[in-house]
């Protein structure tokens, strides 16, 4: 799993992006978030274009409450944005001795094998499980071969990236 310092580093690196999105009114800095309880185990959150951290934190806390009451908690969040590292939220559930599965969509950034156009998002996927020891199992990954941050750093520093992981046409 990611350490607290790598999570903080991720936020720091993306700070300009968040500020730009607030100034362009993509992120609502004063959202009116609505939680609709579908059943005792399921809720739907309309995050009103809040910054993703706020929505994801509310989502995992709501799912944890449901799971503690009924044995399962499912929450869908819409109208939200980038929320950082999925493993951070999975860890919250794991600390409560709960299994967790977190996934999200992302805009097209990945081309299928042999294609010249992006079709799939990076679509992060995260699984967390208590292990019976102090160290939980957290798998925080995506369907891409390399994350965009590494590509951006390589471009900024005029370095190459591994062959076959990005389109250059």
Per-segment meaning from a language model:
Residues 6, 44-46, 140:
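Acidic side chains
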Residues 109-169:
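Phosphate/diphosphate-binding glycine-rich loops and adjacent basic-rich segments that engage nucleotide
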Residues 1-8, 12:
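Single conserved hydrophobic/aromatic residue that forms the stacking wall/gate
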Residues 10-64:
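Active-site cofactor/substrate anionic-group-binding motifs, chiefly glycine-
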Residues 7, 17, 21, 62, ...:
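Alpha-helical scaffold segments in soluble metabolic enzymes
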Residues 15, 19, 24, 30-32, ...:
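Generic secondary-structure boundary/loop-capping signal
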């Amino acid at each position: 799993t990611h350490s607290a310092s790598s999570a903080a580093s991720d936020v720091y690196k993306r700070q300009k992006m968040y500020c730009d999105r607030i100034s362009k009114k993509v992120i609502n800095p004063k959202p009116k978030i609505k939680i609709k309880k579908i059943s005792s185990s399921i809720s739907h959150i309309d995050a009103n274009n809040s910054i993703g951290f706020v929505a994801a934190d509310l989502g995992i806390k709501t799912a944890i409450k449901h799971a503690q009451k009924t044995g399962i908690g499912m929450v869908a969040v819409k109208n939200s944005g980038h929320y950082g590292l999925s493993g951070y939220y999975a860890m919250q559930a794991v600390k409560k001795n709960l299994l967790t599965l977190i996934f999200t969509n992302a805009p097209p950034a990945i081309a299928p094998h042999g294609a010249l156009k992006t079709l799939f998002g990076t679509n992060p996927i995260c699984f967390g499980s208590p292990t019976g020891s102090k160290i939980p199992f957290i798998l925080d990954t995506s369907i891409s071969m390399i994350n965009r941050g590494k590509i951006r750093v390589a471009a900024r520093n005029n370095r190459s990236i591994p062959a076959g992981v990005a389109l250059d046409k």
